[in-house]
């Protein structure tokens, strides 16, 4: 039987304090809180809010190989890349815009643009399996995307500001 949080009914996540204090994870937690328009998760910790982004190996094995993404998965996917864009903006001072084009089958493309510069482009598939093994892996993935995008902006600043 899976342990769940008393506050939110979400699966318990091994709390990684170092991951929770990273700028990217703080931004992601703010965005998740912003989606809670009724305040039903006001008392939840950041780790509890981010538990939906964590998919253990056991949980991943239970997810079918082929499947359509549900609205909750699509929301998590969009929030993740929006957090990347906001973190880029916080670091560089330039507005970064996420563009996601996902089919109903969970295949598509993610772009992040700043000015006329495409700072991130990725073809995605199996969105219904979107998630990370731990909070640390979530933080590392987000930070890497932000670092790579920032490096692209520093390499081509005139295009990013156009």
Swiss-Prot record:
Keywords (A to Z) from UniProt: Nitrogen fixation, Plasmid
NCBIfam families given in the database record: NifX-associated nitrogen fixation protein (TIGR02935)
Coiled-coil region list: none
Pfam families per record: DUF269
GO annotation terms (biological process): nitrogen fixation
Name the UniProt record assigns to this protein: UPF0460 protein y4vQ
Lineage of source species: Bacteria, Pseudomonadati, Pseudomonadota, Alphaproteobacteria, Hyphomicrobiales
UniProt superkingdom: Bacteria
InterPro entries in the cross-refs: NifX-assoc_nitrogen_fix
Family: Belongs to the UPF0460 family.
Source organism: Sinorhizobium fredii (strain NBRC 101917 / NGR234)
């Amino acid at each position: 039987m899976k342990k769940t949080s008393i506050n939110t009914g979400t699966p318990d996540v091994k709390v990684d304090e170092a991951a929770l204090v990273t700028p990217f994870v703080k931004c992601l937690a703010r965005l998740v809180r912003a989606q809670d328009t009724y305040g039903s998760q006001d008392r939840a910790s950041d780790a509890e809010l981010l538990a939906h982004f964590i998919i253990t190996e056991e949980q991943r094995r239970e997810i079918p190989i082929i499947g359509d993404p549900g609205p909750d998965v699509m929301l998590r996917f969009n929030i993740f890349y929006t957090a990347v864009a906001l973190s880029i903006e916080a670091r560089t001072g330039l507005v970064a815009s996420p563009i996601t084009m996902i089919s109903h089958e969970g295949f598509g493309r993610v772009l992040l643009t700043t000015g006329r510069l495409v700072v991130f482009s990725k073809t995605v598939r199996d969105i219904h399996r979107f998630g990370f093994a731990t909070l640390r892996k979530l933080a590392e993935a987000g930070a890497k995307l932000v670092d790579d995008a920032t490096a692209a902006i520093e390499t081509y600043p005139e295009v990013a500001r156009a």
